[in-house]
């Protein structure tokens, strides 16, 4: 069992380039001062140097597995409380709608929706493997904040990700954030004050939806998303232990807390009782398999020397340090481009026991996406003139009752 000294050394030794200046003491005092009210930590709320000091403070609160589990439980409770999901709301009927199956090479796509709360619909697409029998792994694919007519779950890179995973045997659900895709089409705005609550709850209910389908293995649930979808990935994994494998992409950072109110607009990171950051929240995945994918061109640039060593130390308490990995692309920028998908696929194959036959080129190690069909936005939509949205759907922008 490793000691606190080891935990601190893992971060401090790995980051010789990030020296904490003496003048930081006063500034740091303001950051650590306790307040009766929760504090919102948004965007670049603290510097990289302050993040290292914070990691040291947090590591000082535990030195063994029992103490880490106790802290993890407090973090989990703080996330749910801050998101106004504590206690967890009653599971209301999903009333799922799945329609318009399209068959392609090795997989099918269907348009789908369910009610996360009465009248509040979550829209998405189901990708399923063809020619596979028995229960299959289920994978959730939340999306990031990319806008435009083909933004969110409608993006070609999101379709490639889902189709490729389905061709390898997974049942994949790609779904809208509030105010994106079909949600935006029907009038919802991403600035909805309950966005963080709604998206976290929608992700929890998305697991319920997968498990209700009848062909998904309840014990093999994975989730992967990029940017804002990366935030959803580690928040969901932190609060719902049904997730067995997680791959957050270009989002796990000790110094960046998410720039959108749907990520950091509610007090999930800092209260008078406890401070945390997204690096530590991602560590709540332990001891389940976790892969961090990071780049040199955004706030995940320090992953190899800061976030990964901190998280791996926690996996060491479970004696499973090999279950957390990272792939770092020092010369690349933000996004879920092909290189990042190629880093994610083998991790999902390994831990969800997917079958890459017909997709993976064993000679080159490349997962072939050329067999995927990129669909039009109109095809991806769940409701249209012939299939209107149910009349009891909430008016766009309405407060959602919990």
Regions found by a protein language model. Give the residues of each.
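Signal peptide processing junction and immediate N-terminal pro/mature segment
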Residues: 18-28
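Alpha/beta-hydrolase-fold serine-hydrolase catalytic core, especially in secreted/extracellular enzymes
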Residues: 26-121, 286, 293-402
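Glycine-rich nucleophile elbow surrounding the catalytic serine of serine-hydrolase chemistry
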Residues: 225-236
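Mobile cap/lid helix-loop segments that gate and shape the active-site cleft of serine hydrolases
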Residues: 243-288, 295-308, 314-320
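Positively charged n-region of N-terminal signal peptides that target proteins for export
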Residues: 1-5
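Bacterial N-terminal signal peptides
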Residues: 9-19
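Cap/lid segment of the alpha/beta-hydrolase catalytic domain
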Residues: 130-215, 251-267
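Alpha/beta-hydrolase fold nucleophile elbow
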Residues: 215-227
């Amino acid at each position: 069992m490793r000691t606190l000294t080891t935990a601190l050394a893992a971060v401090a030794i790995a980051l010789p380039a990030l020296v904490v200046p003496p003048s930081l003491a006063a500034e740091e005092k303001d950051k650590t001062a306790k307040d009766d009210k929760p504090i919102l930590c948004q965007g670049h709320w603290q510097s990289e140097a302050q993040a290292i000091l914070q990691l040291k403070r947090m590591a000082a609160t535990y030195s063994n597995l029992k103490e880490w589990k106790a802290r993890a439980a407090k973090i989990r409770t703080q996330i749910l409380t801050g998101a106004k999901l504590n206690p967890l709301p009653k599971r209301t009927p999903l009333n799922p709608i799945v329609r318009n199956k399209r068959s392609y090479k090795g997989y099918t796509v269907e348009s789908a929706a369910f009610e996360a709360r009465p009248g509040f619909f979550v829209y998405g697409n189901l990708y399923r493997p063809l020619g596979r029998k028995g229960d299959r792994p289920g994978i959730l694919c939340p999306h990031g904040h990319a806008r435009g007519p083909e933004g969110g779950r409608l993006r070609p890179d999101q379709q490639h990700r889902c189709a490729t995973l389905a061709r390898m045997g997974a049942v994949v659900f790609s779904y809208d954030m509030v105010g994106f895709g079909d949600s935006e089409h029907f009038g919802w705005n991403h600035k909805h004050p309950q966005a963080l609550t709604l998206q976290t709850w929608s992700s929890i209910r998305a697991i319920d939806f997968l498990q209700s389908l009848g062909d998904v293995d309840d014990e093999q649930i994975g989730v992967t998303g990029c940017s804002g979808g990366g935030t959803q990935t580690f928040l969901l994994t932190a609060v719902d232990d049904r997730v067995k494998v997680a791959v957050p992409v270009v989002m796990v950072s000790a110094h960046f807390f998410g720039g959108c109110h749907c990520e950091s607009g509610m007090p999930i990171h800092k209260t008078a009782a406890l401070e945390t950051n997204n690096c530590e929240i991602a560590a709540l995945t332990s001891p389940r398999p976790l892969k961090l994918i990071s780049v040199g061109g955004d706030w995940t640039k320090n992953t190899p020397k800061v976030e990964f060593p901190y998280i791996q130390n926690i996996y060491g308490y479970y004696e499973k340090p090999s279950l957390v990995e990272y792939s770092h692309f020092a010369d690349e920028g933000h996004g879920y481009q092909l290189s990042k998908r190629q880093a994610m696929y083998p991790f999902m194959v390994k831990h969800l026991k997917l079958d890459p036959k017909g997709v993976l080129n064993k000679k080159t190690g490349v997962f072939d996406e050329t067999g995927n069909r990129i669909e039009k936005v109109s095809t991806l939509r769940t409701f249209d003139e012939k299939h209107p949205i149910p009349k009891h759907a909430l008016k766009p922008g309405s407060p959602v009752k919990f």
